[in-house]
Amino acid sequence: MSTFRQAVQEYIEMRRGLGFKLRETERGLIDFAAFLEANDTPHITTELALAWAQRPSRAQPSHWATRLGYVRVFARYRAAADPRTQIPPSGLLPFRPKRARPYLYSKEDIQRLLSAALEMPCRYTRCKLRPWTYYCLFGLLSVSGLRLGEARNLKLADVDFDAAVLTIRGTKFGKSRLVPMHASTCAVLRDYLKRRRQHCAAQAASPYLFTSQLGNRLDVGDIHRTFYALSRQIGLRGATDSHGPRLHDMRHVFATNTLVRWYEAEQDPERLLPILSTYLGHVHVADTQWYLTGSPELMKEAMRRLERRWEDRT
């Protein structure tokens, strides 16, 4: 293994020790190492970093910017050991990512989605649990603020009914956290597990909470396809729409509803925001602030509080 490739591996291991997963980063930097070797250059130069980042030439600018970002961050690390390293300056491949505008689900939207899940047809005996699986999965996402991957990866051992707590492991940033459950959520999950034991008695018990009719962990593609089909069925998406409400938007709604309740209870949202950030599994409070944009209820409560402050001063 070349010295540069070894440096890449050491860098990845160091960052993973801090909780980052870096799967795409690792693939990108290994490819960049091969690119440097092909150009007979043992150290990073801005010129070669740009040349590598802009491959393939038909890719989107966002792809180029992401690739250059991998190299820039690694170059800062590498410069400590190799003073010949050039750190590509920021702004060489400017790109401002456009976040999808979140859909603010109403209570009625969620109720119709869950009802449609329970009404999904079952052709075979072994798939009779499927409606209940998606009813519970979508319901849990709507009341917990979990990421889809976190809910999908839940294991039976992660559900503590006595303490009314979920243990979320292997999260986006590699950290575990505890998420409390409401009594009604516990009741629904208990009922689901009872039905699961009845319908899957002949199968080997899966360690995962949400399983397919074959007893495996739910496939993420099937989850999205099911959600899209149900969304079109209840009118959240048009029959031919390729874009529309997403499952991740439930997380946004959970965060905004939490802040609205704080406003209505006359609590200080700025002081409590770090608590919500920890609950959601964010590393930085700024990551949580994104979820708190675009809500009419939030704007109304913020304006109400601002008007009261002005009244108190006059």
From Swiss-Prot:
Residues 100-304 form the Tyr recombinase domain. The active site is at R147, K172, H248, R251, H282, Y291. It comes from the Bacteria. CDD domains: INT_RitB_C_like (cd00797). GO terms for biological process: DNA integration; DNA recombination; establishment of integrated proviral latency; symbiont entry into host cell; viral genome integration into host DNA. SUPFAM superfamilies: DNA breaking-rejoining enzymes. GO terms for molecular function: DNA binding. Residues 2-79 form the Core-binding (CB) domain. The keyword DNA-binding applies. Transmembrane segments: none annotated. Keywords: DNA integration, DNA recombination, DNA-binding, Plasmid, Transposable element, Viral genome integration, Virus entry into host cell. Belongs to the 'phage' integrase family. PANTHER family: INTEGRASE_RECOMBINASE PROTEIN MJ0367-RELATED, PHAGE INTEGRASE-RELATED. This is Putative integrase/recombinase y4rB. It comes from Sinorhizobium fredii (strain NBRC 101917 / NGR234).
